[in-house]
Amino acid sequence: MAVVRTDLTGGVMTLTLDRPEKLNAFTIEMMQELIDAFDVADADDAVRAVVVTGAGRAFCAGADIFGGTKGFVDVEKRKVGAGTVRDGGGLLTLRIFDGLKPVIAAVNGAAVGVGATMQLPMDMRLASEDPKFGFVFGRRGIVPEACSSWFLPRVVGISKAMEWSTT
């Protein structure tokens, strides 16, 4: 089942995160579909820019932590080197950073966790009138993910990055 809709109109490829019933919560499937779409965009000369947006009332509410327990069941599979994805948001963030086409975030509603961090390597971020950005890692007792500890200070400055990451 596709969780990212793609549309190419007038040289602009629009990627729409399409899980509105879950506020477009991020999954490994979504990560792979986005990476694949960025690969297609880079390979297609008809694509001049990429816009990433969310369906419904949110851009992306962060990682889908309620998506089931199958990732936690087999402890052996979670060991380093066992082929598991540890930071899907980081893989996506680096893919966007390595891209050849300009990327614009069109933010509607909430952009939390990976929903905020995936935007950091994008060239522009445009927001609706009432967006909600959340770098909630400190409140969750986890370290910032998706390469945000590298990108965030470069986008907003070290002082603002520290404030956003720790409060």
Segments predicted by a language model, with ranges:
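Glycine- (often His-adjacent) and acidic-residue-rich active-site loop
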Residues: 54-98, 111, 141
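Residues at secondary-structure transition points
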Residues: 3, 21, 25, 32, ...
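Conserved CoA-thioester-binding segment of acyl-CoA-metabolizing enzymes
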Residues: 1-55, 71
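A generic local structural motif
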Residues: 1-3, 35-39, 89-94, 120, ...
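Hydrophobic/aromatic residues within transmembrane alpha-helices
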Residues: 15, 52, 64, 118-119
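Histidine-centered beta-alpha loop that forms part of the nucleotide-sugar donor binding/catalytic region
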Residues: 18, 63, 108
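Crotonase-fold acyl-CoA enzyme core
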Residues: 94-167
